[in-house]
């Protein structure tokens, strides 16, 4: 799925994150997504400069469950990218 339908702010974050992240439709909304194998990460929000980002880390096995959540993150792509690097270090298989 391409970045079409994302806001300018979300596209900017997707570009900052690089090719490991993609766009995925989750619950009818386009989000930025990365699959880590047994876990995945969903980044939503950020539709405008004032709108915060929200990050959810999902455990997929043995059942689907949110294991970490980061809510109301300021719209700072570099800061969000650093947090996602830390998350990747914990969950990337």
Task: Name each model-derived stretch.
Residues 1-39, 58-78, 90-92:
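Negatively charged, low-complexity tracts enriched in Asp/Glu with abundant Ser/Thr
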Residues 83-90:
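C-terminal alpha-helix
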């Amino acid at each position: 799925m391409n970045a079409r339908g994302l806001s300018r702010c979300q596209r900017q974050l997707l570009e900052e994150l690089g090719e490991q992240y993609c766009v995925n439709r989750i619950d009818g909304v386009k989000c930025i997504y990365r699959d880590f194998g047994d876990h995945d990460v969903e980044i939503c929000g950020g539709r405008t400069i004032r709108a915060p980002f929200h990050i959810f880390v999902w455990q997929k096995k043995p059942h689907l469950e949110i294991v970490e959540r980061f809510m109301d993150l300021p719209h700072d792509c570099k800061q969000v990218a650093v947090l996602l690097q830390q998350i990747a270090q914990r969950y990337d298989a």
